[in-house]
Structures are given as structure tokens and as C-alpha cells.
Swiss-Prot record:
Presence of the UniProt keyword Transit peptide in the record: no
Organism, as annotated: Methanosarcina acetivorans (strain ATCC 35395 / DSM 2834 / JCM 12185 / C2A)
Gene Ontology CC: one annotated term: ribonucleoprotein complex
Record-level Gene Ontology MF annotations: large ribosomal subunit rRNA binding; structural constituent of ribosome
Family listed: Belongs to the eukaryotic ribosomal protein eL20 family.
InterPro entries in UniProt: Ribosomal_eL20 (IPR028877), Ribosomal_eL20_dom (IPR023573)
Lineage top rank: taxon: Archaea
Alphabetical keyword list: Ribonucleoprotein, Ribosomal protein, RNA-binding, rRNA-binding
Oligomeric and partner information: Part of the 50S ribosomal subunit. Binds 23S rRNA.
BP term (GO), one: translation
Protein name: Large ribosomal subunit protein eL20
Amino acid sequence: MVMMKSFIVKGKFKAGSTWEKFTKKIESQNEKNATDKTYSIFGSKHGVKRSQVQIESVAEE
């Protein structure tokens, strides 16, 4: 069984004509997967493309 770690991902995403800040807690195996999962969540929930999401930091909790 693979151990999942908690990561805190901070950044901003394009909401209309403005940028909105966000902080998300993501369960993932590593930092790269946490970043990809964040892009995926914003794409599915907010309909934004990866280029409209700017991740500023990823830290293990």
C-alpha cells in the first residue's frame, strides 16, 4: 500500500477578469502528483485551463 502525504498548495486562478487566491489541502504520493491533482480539480470544478492556474507553493504538511 502506498503512503499518502498531505500537501498544502497555494496559488491563484483566473476567475473572469480577476485572479483569486486559493489554498488547498491535497492528499498525494508526492509533490508533483499534488500539483497535477490541483490542476485537475480546478479544471473540473471551475472550468479553467492549466495556464489559468498559477501555483505559488507546495509544502508537505
